[in-house]
């Protein structure tokens, strides 16, 4: 008789689950620590043939470590994927893996497997005539036909004219110029140049530049446009009058603030509170507080700042903030002081001065002679 077949793995696992369920009936839902340990022990005995739990955990940790190491090696040996811009056709680029003989995608590869694709996609230079002989080219590699061609061209005077070929310009404007384009005026024997001069702008590019200039606006127009977009009801238009009024308001506020701070500092010093006061404030209000502060501090020395007599200073007088339709207390004060000075000067001018009082030359001479005699 043939031997009995061993039970399948699926049937064996089902049997083990049945045994575990029978032995742990009513214990899985209990949250006690002892019950949970007992359930885990029963599951280990049935599933792992009574293998120790710590050995099972060690085996699982070893498998996980081996898997992680394999994953790290794969990441290190993973080739760099070739990238391409969105607006570039991948078939116009050579596959870097195919160039090294490593690409296994074959026809499914999105990059080109043609080694000459770079030459096919390269555009012909519009600013260099391909017919012109290079500067470093010599007659060492010329054959008999090339030599005869050069001699005949020199004898006939068939030199290239500096004028650009009209057929070349037409082909460039219509995007027909390329590696396989031939000039209708004799092909390579055309005496006109087949290259654009330096700085030349094509008509199609010129139109695009003009259209772009039309869309552009000057900085003045941009400023006016942004100003027009603002809500004029909530904002004040900036003029000379509004600026001067704002400046005077700020000066007045600054003066009031300085007076208030000065008053607060005076009250603070009177009350004997010097905390938070700078040395300059203490010296201005009461210099004795500084002089008598410490006898061992030494004498107080002050250095006078040097003033450059040739330095020009921008003076701001009452006329700087003056304009029609605006009251100015500073103007009134200065006008009153000016009138007072002028009245005093007029009174002094009208006074009778006895010039004999200042004629002391003779007396001075007598004094000098007396001193000499002594």
From Swiss-Prot:
Keywords: Metal-binding, Repeat, Zinc, Zinc-finger. It holds the Pfam family zf-CCCH. SUPFAM superfamilies: CCCH zinc finger. Coiled coil: none annotated. GO terms for biological process: cytoplasmic translation. It comes from the Eukaryota. GO terms for molecular function: zinc ion binding. A zinc finger (C3H1-type) spans 89-116, 167-197. One of its GO terms (cellular component) is cytosol. Transmembrane segments: none annotated. PANTHER family: ZINC FINGER CCCH DOMAIN-CONTAINING PROTEIN 15, ZINC FINGER-CONTAINING PROTEIN P48ZNF. Belongs to the ZC3H15/TMA46 family. This is Zinc finger CCCH domain-containing protein 15 homolog.
């Amino acid at each position: 008789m043939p031997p009995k077949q061993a039970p399948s793995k699926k049937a064996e696992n089902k049997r083990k689950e049945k045994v575990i369920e029978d032995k742990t009936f009513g214990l899985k839902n209990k949250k006690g620590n002892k019950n949970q340990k007992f359930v885990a022990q029963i599951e280990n005995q049935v599933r792992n043939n009574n293998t120790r739990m710590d050995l099972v955990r060690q085996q699982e940790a070893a498998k996980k470590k081996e898997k992680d190491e394999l994953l790290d090696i794969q990441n290190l040996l993973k080739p760099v994927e070739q990238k391409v811009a969105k607006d570039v056709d991948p078939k116009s680029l050579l596959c870097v893996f195919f160039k090294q003989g490593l690409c296994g995608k074959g026809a499914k590869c999105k990059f080109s497997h043609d080694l000459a694709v770079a030459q096919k996609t390269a555009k012909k230079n519009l600013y260099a005539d391909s017919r012109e002989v290079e500067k470093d080219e010599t007659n060492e590699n010329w054959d008999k036909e090339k030599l005869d061609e050069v001699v005949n061209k020199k004898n006939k005077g068939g030199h290239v004219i500096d004028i650009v070929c009209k057929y070349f310009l037409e082909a460039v404007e219509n995007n027909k110029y390329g590696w396989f384009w031939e000039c209708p005026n004799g092909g390579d024997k055309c005496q006109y140049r087949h290259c654009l001069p330096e700085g030349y702008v094509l008509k199609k590019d010129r139109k695009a530049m003009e259209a772009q200039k039309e869309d552009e606006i000057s900085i003045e127009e941009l400023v006016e446009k942004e100003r027009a977009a603002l809500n004029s009801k909530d904002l004040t238009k900036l003029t000379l009058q509004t600026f001067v009024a704002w400046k005077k308001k700020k000066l007045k506020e600054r003066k009031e603030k300085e007076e208030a701070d000065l008053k607060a500092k005076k009250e603070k010093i009177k009350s004997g509170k010097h905390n938070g006061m700078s040395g300059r404030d203490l010296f201005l209000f009461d210099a004795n507080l500084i002089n008598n502060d410490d006898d061992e501090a030494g004498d107080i020395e002050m250095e006078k700042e040097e003033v450059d007599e040739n330095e020009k200073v921008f003076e701001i007088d009452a006329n700087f903030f003056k304009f029609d339709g605006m009251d100015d207390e500073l103007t009134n004060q200065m006008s009153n002081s000016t009138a007072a000075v002028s009245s005093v000067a007029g009174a002094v001018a009208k006074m009778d001065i006895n010039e004999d009082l200042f004629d002391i030359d003779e007396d001075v001479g007598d004094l000098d002679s007396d001193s000499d005699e002594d």
